[in-house]
Amino acid sequence: MSEPFKSGFVAIVGRPNVGKSTLLNHIIGQKIAIMSDKAQTTRNKVQGVYTTDESQIIFIDTPGIHKPKHKLGDFMVKIALNTFQEVDLIYFVIDASTGFGRGDEFIIEKLKNVQTPVFLLINKIDLISPEDLFKLIEQYRELLDFEEIIPISALQGNNVPNLLEQTNANLEIGPMYYPKDQITDHPERFIISELIREQVLQLTREEVPHSVAVVIEGIEKNPKTEKLTINATIIVERSTQKGIIIGKQGQMLKQIGMRARKEIESLLGSKVFLEIWVKVQKNWRDKEHYLHDYGFDREEY
């Protein structure tokens, strides 16, 4: 007789840049969470769905927890903390190469107040010696009663199968919430805007901070050629940032568009014509109506 089907919700938390999105994308096998080495790149709860014959795990990738500096930051932290209460299991991801930091202390204090079981995932183990890894495990073991402590490399996939096995063991019998072939519940528009934003952050590096939002104005399909036309607007806070994104003779914007288009085509499996505009909206991160317009919906959280 076959085992009963199991399912559950798992939150992935940790301070910025520890590899949460990399882990989620490795498990799902497709890029659904924006990846960049800048802090705070994941803004909304991106759900990834991992389904096998035995179980379904719904992953919630939360923003990196940090001390908020403005309304957007405050909003991001609130999402992460609310998520702790809603899930069946929490992955607390840390970066082995940077060791214990104040950000980790802040998260552990929050985790002490929840009943949800917590897995400590020590990521980037390929960057430290076994001796240092052992010391790190001992250090964290004294801070919280973790359900499991699992060293991994999210980038290379080391020990991820073991992590999924342990996760399954902690799930309850439950329904299949999503169709087997569905990997995220985020609408395509959201993922397309995130793919464009990822290229902006990667190509402009430190020059353009997180005062960037991307709004998809329209998606049209040509019935004859099946080609998609996507109109997008990049929103920044200052005209200097607009200049950086457009670049000399429009070269930077061209690069952003070219790279984003390839990612979008690979996601949607069809040819895309991508048109991008850049618009200045001063201090949008501190104005609630702008946050709502750019996809940050307070009602949802």
UniProtKB/Swiss-Prot annotation:
Residues 204-282 form the KH type-2 domain. Its main location: cytoplasm. GTP binds at residues 14-21, 61-65, 123-126. It is a peripheral membrane protein. It holds the Pfam family MMR_HSR1. Residues 61-64 are annotated as: G3. Residues 152-154 are annotated as: G5. NCBIfam families: era (TIGR00436), PRK00089.1 (NF000908), small_GTP (TIGR00231). Monomer. This is GTPase Era. It comes from Listeria welshimeri serovar 6b (strain ATCC 35897 / DSM 20650 / CCUG 15529 / CIP 8149 / NCTC 11857 / SLCC 5334 / V8). The gene is era.
